[in-house]
Design a protein with these regions (language model features):
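Intrinsically disordered, low-complexity terminal regions
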Residues: 1-253
Length: 253
């Protein structure tokens, strides 16, 4: 009797394994044509995108062949648009794009997937994220302008430049890591800013929403609070200017 039970369990396990193997999605790879003029990337749909610096411009897509066929990539001058014409449910992580570019000036995403950017440097980088996706940036630019809407997340790390100009108007969160001469942040939504690990000489915060912010300022801190959120300032700046017209508060650490 025990042998029959064991054989039954083994057979059931084998059929389950075969079912999983047969159900495993097919993965295909495509190389799409682009050239080195591309310095701006606009992303939409359900694509995980990785952008890295390299001497030759290339774009490689991978994923289910049915979804690859509905992934649209169009270059218009210096701008590359990536979108998916997919209706219905798509599992996150099922579509991947590997993009290599010599230079980069702008990344704009309305995707629900993740976007990673690394290895670039230059004068100015413009970032925009709307929706429920995520963006992780590890680059070295003199000036970084970043805008976050929706419920997504943005992580800017290894920063080392003149300044960062941040606009947070959604319910997501932003983390900054590195240093710069100045940080300017306009926080008007429900989201939060964690810049404790971002050392700035001067910090200028306009907070009109419900979110909270943590920043590090070593010389100047100019804070204007008109919402319900609060600001925590590290670094013991010598020059402090605070205006509070709401329920928020300022803490010095």
């Amino acid at each position: 009797m025990n042998k029959l039970v064991k054989l039954g369990l083994a057979a059931a396990g084998l059929w389950a394994w075969l079912g999983m193997a047969l159900a495993a999605p097919e993965v295909a790879t495509e190389t799409r044509p682009i050239d080195a003029r591309v310095v701006r990337v606009k992303l939409d749909g359900a694509v995980d995108l990785r952008i890295r610096q390299g001497s030759t411009a290339t774009l490689i897509l991978s994923g289910d062949p049915r979804w690859l066929a509905k992934t649209i990539t169009v270059q218009s001058g210096d701008t590359l648009n990536i979108d998916t014409d997919i209706h219905g449910r798509v599992h996150l992580g099922a579509l991947h794009a590997e993009l290599t570019l010599p230079a980069l000036r702008e990344v704009s995403s309305e995707s629900v997937g993740s976007t990673e950017v690394s290895g670039f440097s230059g004068e100015e980088l413009e970032l925009s994220l709307d929706g429920a996706g995520s963006m992780r940036i590890s680059c070295n630019y003199k000036l970084v302008s970043a805008s976050l809407g929706g419920v997504g997340s943005m992580h800017l790390q290894s920063l080392s430049g003149e300044g960062v100009d941040l606009n947070l108007h959604g319910a997501g969160f932003v983390t900054l890591n590195g240093r710069a001469k100045w940080l300017k942040a306009d926080l008007g939504g429900l989201g939060s800013l964690d810049a404790r690990e971002f050392a700035a000489d001067s910090v200028n915060i306009e907070l009109s929403g419900l979110g909270n912010a943590s920043v590090t300022a070593h010389q100047n801190a100019n804070l204007n609070l008109s919402g319900m959120g609060s600001v925590t300032v590290y670094g013991k700046p010598l020059n402090r200017k605070v205006a509070v017209d709401g329920l928020g508060k300022v803490s010095w650490k």
